């Protein structure tokens, strides 16, 4: 968990903002949302496979766009 030390004469709202930024960088919120409900191992595999397919299709699309430009 990220920790933020409040500096001397630093307003609390700025320290809170730094803490929020540190949490966002560490991925705390996304991890909490991901673990909010139990996900079956088959669903995890299915979700990861779908994400991999999506990444692959996106990569192919980017490569075809690069090769078709002839100007």
UniProtKB/Swiss-Prot annotation:
Top-rank taxon: Bacteria
Q: Show the PROSITE patterns listed in the entry.
A: RIBOSOMAL_S21
Say if the entry is tagged with keyword Cell division: no
Query: What's any GO biological process attached to this entry?
Result: translation
Annotated Gene Ontology cellular component terms:
ribonucleoprotein complex; ribosome
Q: Ribosomal protein as a keyword?
A: yes
- List S-S links within the chain: none
Q: Name one GO molecular function term.
A: structural constituent of ribosome
Which InterPro entries does its entry note?
Answer: Ribosomal_bS21, Ribosomal_bS21_CS, Ribosomal_bS21_sf
Report keywords, A-Z: Ribonucleoprotein, Ribosomal protein
**Family membership noted in the UniProt record:** Belongs to the bacterial ribosomal protein bS21 family.
Name of the protein this chain belongs to: Small ribosomal subunit protein bS21
Organism of provenance? Psychrobacter arcticus (strain DSM 17307 / VKM B-2377 / 273-4)
Q: Which gene encodes it?
A: rpsU
């Amino acid at each position: 968990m990220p920790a933020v030390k409040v500096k001397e004469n630093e307003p609390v709202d700025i320290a809170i903002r730094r803490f929020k930024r540190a949490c966002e960088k560490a991925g705390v919120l996304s991890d909490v949302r991901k673990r909010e409900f139990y996900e079956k191992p088959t669903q995890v595999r299915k979700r990861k496979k779908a994400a991999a397919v999506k990444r692959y299709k996106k990569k192919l699309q980017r490569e075809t766009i690069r090769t078709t430009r002839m100007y």
